[in-house]
Amino acid sequence: MSVQFIRGTAVADLEAPLIQATKQWLEEDAQHEVFYLVPNHIKFEQEIQVLQKLRQLQTTTSDSITSTRLQVFSFYRLAWYYLQHTPFYSADVLSDAGAAMIFRKILVEAEEELQIFRGEINKPGFIQQLFQLYQEMREGNIEIAELYPFLEKQTENPKGQDLQLKFQDLTLIFTRFQLQMSQYGYESAEIIQHLSEYLQTVDLSNVQFVISGYQQFTARELKLIEVLMAQAGSVKVALLLDKQYPHDLPDPRSLFYEAGQTYHQLYQLARQKQIPILSDYVEKKEVLITNPDLQGLNDYWIQSQEHLPPLSTADWRGDGLFLWRAENVKEELTHVATEIRRLVVEEGYRYKEIQVLTRDLDCYENLLEPIFAEHEIPVYVDRDMAMDRHPLVEWIESLFAIHSYNYRYRDVLRFLRTELFMPMNQLATSEESLTDWLNQRNAWRRKVDITENVVLAYGYEGYYWSQEKDWEFIRYDFEAEEQEDVATMEEESNAIRQSLQRLLPSYFQAMISAKTGLEAATVFYHFLLQSGVATQLKMWRLQAIEAGQLETARNHEQTWDALMSLLDEYVTVYGESSFDFTTFQEIFVSGLEGLHYSKVPTAIDQVQVRAMDLTRPGAAKVTFAIGMTEEIFPQKIENKTLLSDEERQTINDTLTENQYLRGTTGRKIAQEPYVAYLVFSSARERLYLTYPSVKDTAQEVKPSPYFKNIQKDLNLPVFEKNETTIFDDETTSLAHISTYRTLIGELTRLKRQRKETQEGLLPFWLNMEKALMNQSIAPLAKQVFESLTHQNIPEKIDEVLAEPLYGKDIYTSVSRMESFYRCQYQYFSRYGLRLKERDVFGLSPAATGEFFHEALDQFFKLLIMNQRNLSELTDQEVNLLAEEVLNSILGDARFSVLTTSSRMNYIRYQLSQTIKKVSWALKRQSQRSGMTTVQTEVLFGQIAAKKGISGLELPLKNQGKIHVRGKIDRIDQLVTPESTYLGVIDYKSSHRKFNMTEAYYGLAMQMLTYLDVALMDAVQLVGQEAKPAGSLYLHVHNPTLSYEGKDDIEQQMLKKYQFDGLLMKDPDLLDHLDTSLQAKQSSLLFPIEESAKEQIKPGRRQEDKFVTEPELGALLSHNRNKFIEAGNQIIGGEVQLNPAYQGKERIACRYCPFRSVCDFDVMLKENNYHRIENLSKEEIMARLLNKDEEGATEDE
């Protein structure tokens, strides 16, 4: 029975005397055993290290047997070793998630009794904070019931009263928690206590305990060590400590304060128990840190923190410590990877002998693995990965959301997209079945894709999913004016809907009907199996194993195991309680989100990446400490516990020597120099301290004060680590290259710089490129280098390919041709490649326009059919007629969207009001005008299965024709004694004016084409040849009127519905357009006015809207030529990226859905807008009238 302290600074190899003592103890007696106790996070590495060093010391065959009597454990593993067959381990120990359930249950039951913490159960993280405080108090050997009497006296000040009330709540919660936990098993803190009690009854005289890697212990761990010192044959305690503290505590500002305090505590415990204390062994011979510079850094840091005289830097060699400042985070990691690769290739290091330390893994994680992969460096990131990103967690969250929000479509799609809901026959895990499963999964995935499109297009939510009736829907193409075949879509989307409807409603009902937690857990478990979740995870695991992704396979297995454990613990805690579905959902969502995967390195020879706080002296031969900025080193520490620093200090002042709470925030901040000391001593041969000068969005990031102090006090250079430039010499350039894959990136950057600077590459780089092109990676390099000369210019399609794409004859509409002139690539994408955006539920502009057109068409057809004159109807008759039309249209399946929600019902009302207002205006217009409507919705050309009057058929250069189709909304006729005139009316749901420039450039071909067709087929339309009246727009809307307008309401309203467009400058026509006009008046219907001399003429500033017959003829001829020009370019394979730009408006790109396809970027010199020159009417007419036939199809 004895205890001995093994001391030394980080330079000393404290493990050497421990291994020697272990060997000696094992050799003394065949019954002797050794338990090596280390922190859990280094147990794996320490076990390998201890066994290796022990093997090196053994010299005979018999000696090698001694290692079987050596165990490397953590304290909790030691508890399992001794207590596994005792009642303490006979019951299942609840996990942290199970303990959180008990806390939740207590908080709900005791809510009315709580004062400070009432209602805190709904605060995110509160239960975790509560559990952490409980564990802290148990580990600190503190019974809360003992504290409360003292705290009752702390009522002199408000803070004392708050602390008393807080502990009143905590006493209630923790007392009930302990009572409940006694029914289920012992939590970890209790296990240590029971181990201490158990070991007092065990003969440990043949056992030596070696304790290493700790600097401080919890109160219960100290009690356990006290038992070990009293019972064991020998106890060795290794502490990173510069001197002994047998009688006095160290100065709180000391670098080794924590270790010194631990030394003092253990020394005093041994003295009190009269346990022999052997002389300290201070290691001075065996050196852990072998590089003299790093030894000097160790001494410097101790002296600077202990305020001792500074060191001399005269003997500094400069081969062990390197300070880097990188241009940014990416360059920092790139240079680290390059240096690692160099160390391995040139200096013989192994990857496992190198570690990367950081305190900001969130910043580096996304870049680290890809960059290291480029450099072909195997890496292991020692970080617990949360389960919250696993599809199973998403599946559970979306399942609960479906119930909470009644089949909201985004929740249903989230649920389906996890691909865990796949009800199918259970498959065996054989190679054949994996192929079968993949085929089934792909088929299911396709059905889900189709279902998603259907749901987005039709807005299926709520009862649409739970009803037994299958979905029935129509799909109407408003442009082509035809109904699409949706039989396959209906069948496949309904297959998905039926699967959900068969399982989900009954599951939710069963859960709601469950009486107890056990009953609900049983329902949930069976639903997991019925849904195919267990099978899917099993197949995912098998698929990952087949692909060699062992970590992914383990994650799938661990996630399922975690869910099953959570379910078991839920039954343990809530099994006999009344079931509450809301609590059940909260427990399982938060329970899985808080869990982490346990990780094991998948390969031995890997670079280790870990947190700075978890390192230890001499952990690796080479250490890269990255991200050494002032933001995180020293770390800014906040108190996020339930007790403030002041409250902690108050409590600590009342505790006995064997009780304590963890230190305050100030104490943790004071420990930061010690963390830095561990980082600086973590490397045995080389240490690299690096930081980025730019991080995220922060510019001019400052280095850590520790970094600056080392650089200044030791007079060390800071090496700049930047991107390669074309001006770098060969030595500097070589520092950027470690593999052929990285060479591709460097050469790409340099070639781009050469292009920008016109500087030549060094011969060194040309030789490197030549060597690269002889490697297997050459095809990738070639592809990347080609990107430097790539221009975002679409290739012209061969005419042989264009014909099967578009046909020999082109059947088109006016809007399609206008699209071609807006941007040829847009036309190619939509009508060549047939790309189309997914339909999204709602009333589209096309559907709105179709609604208005259909309503007005039926309105006039009823008038014509009933041989009624609109001008003769009363307002009431007009209103009744409009109502009849609306009732007919709103029952049409094309507009069923208008009945799907309250919002849509309101839109329906607004559309109806608009039609009624327009009907009112049409009546007033008919009373004032000589124009009468003779036909509506006049088809020309072939539209779907319908064939109308003759459309335009124009010749193309390939001997084919371009066939133009369309639908004229309305044709009006005006008959005078001298002539018959035809005019076309086009309804627009937005305000539109005829623009001569747009017509000239092919951007507005509709009105000229419609008028051309009407005149061409006049005999068929009105029974005789007719003269043109014009093409006019009618704005279909429900106008807002000015309250203070000088005109009366009717005049204001008619002004809002005034026709706008192109009119003939024909006196006979103008005299009869508005029969209500009087001298010195402007028409409310047309852009005309009557002069004082009773002469009808174009209105003020309206001249550009009027043309003569020769001018109209030129416009119509030019319009036809634009069709021919576009048709010839289309069949010729022209695909230019030339979006039109007029004035300050990007008319082609503004609403274009293909921007992500064409990648048009005005910053690229090869991408330019087709800028539309604004021309006056006179300029256009001069060009058209003076143009000879040879240039008739050319654009200026």
From Swiss-Prot:
SUPFAM superfamilies, A to Z: P-loop containing nucleoside triphosphate hydrolases
Gene Ontology biological-process entries: double-strand break repair via homologous recombination
Entry EC number(s): 3.1.-.-
GO molecular function terms attached to this record: 4 iron, 4 sulfur cluster binding; 5'-3' exonuclease activity; ATP binding; double-stranded DNA binding; helicase activity; hydrolase activity, acting on acid anhydrides; metal ion binding
Stored HAMAP family: AddB_type2
Function field: The heterodimer acts as both an ATP-dependent DNA helicase and an ATP-dependent, dual-direction single-stranded exonuclease. Recognizes the chi site generating a DNA molecule suitable for the initiation of homologous recombination. This subunit has 5' -> 3' nuclease activity but not helicase activity.
Official protein name in the record: ATP-dependent helicase/deoxyribonuclease subunit B
Phylogenetic lineage: Bacteria, Bacillati, Bacillota, Bacilli, Lactobacillales
